[in-house]
């Protein structure tokens, strides 16, 4: 048997880079978090509260279940950002998900574990198939909430995270904004403008020597 590549040498890997833009969450949970944000808004619009939640079902792919479907105690931020139930519970309750939401003092809020215990994952074989499809590489999740009065939310399906190739037009402005925001945390305004003038202008960037480019990121 001779080894054979899946495709000829090319730019496939770079074209399919996943950018983590929307949430500080493990990638298999990105679309679940986005769906949870939508359901948080839906509950507010329909007079529902998290206290009325009976069960949350996450229809998902096999990798999500294998890697981040976790029950029981979560001992530290690393445990929490690899638990899909935790990452979904936070936006359902608070309408946000930030790095601080993984810290011990925040995780002590009893509402989080109460909602976590009501969240269950079920595998969808089509989601798993599309996850492995090299032309799709979807990371799909679908969320439904069942309430104590017997009513249900609509199912919110998100197939691709914002950082996915199929959402580039939507994602690139957000990625640039994240880049600029993080630069501003380190450099003054003038220095940031110097870096952005080069790095956000492809024609200029391709002519810059690598050592010159890296020197721009030295804080004096």
Task: Please place each PLM-identified region on the residue numbering.
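Terminal-appendage/accessory-domain detector
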Residues: 1-220
């Amino acid at each position: 048997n001779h080894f054979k590549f899946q495709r000829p040498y090319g730019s496939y890997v770079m074209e399919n880079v996943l950018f983590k833009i929307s949430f500080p969450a493990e990638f298999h949970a990105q679309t679940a978090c986005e769906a949870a944000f939508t359901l948080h808004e839906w509950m507010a619009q329909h007079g529902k509260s998290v206290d009325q939640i009976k069960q949350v079902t996450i229809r998902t792919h096999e990798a999500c279940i294998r890697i981040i479907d976790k029950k029981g105690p979560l001992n530290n931020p690393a445990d929490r950002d690899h638990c899909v139930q935790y990452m979904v519970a936070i936006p359902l309750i608070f309408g946000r998900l930030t790095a601080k939401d993984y810290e011990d003092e925040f995780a002590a809020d009893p509402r989080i574990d109460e909602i976590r215990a009501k969240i269950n994952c079920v595998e969808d074989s089509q989601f798993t198939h599309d996850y492995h499809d090299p032309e799709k590489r979807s990371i799909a999740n679908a969320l439904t909430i069942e309430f104590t009065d017997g009513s249900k939310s609509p199912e919110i399906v998100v197939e691709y995270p914002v950082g996915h190739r199929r959402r580039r037009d939507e994602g690139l402005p957000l990625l640039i904004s994240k880049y600029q925001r993080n630069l501003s945390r380190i450099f003054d305004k003038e220095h940031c403008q110097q870096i952005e003038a080069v790095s956000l202008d492809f024609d200029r960037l391709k002519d810059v020597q690598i050592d010159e480019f890296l020197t721009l990121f030295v804080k004096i």
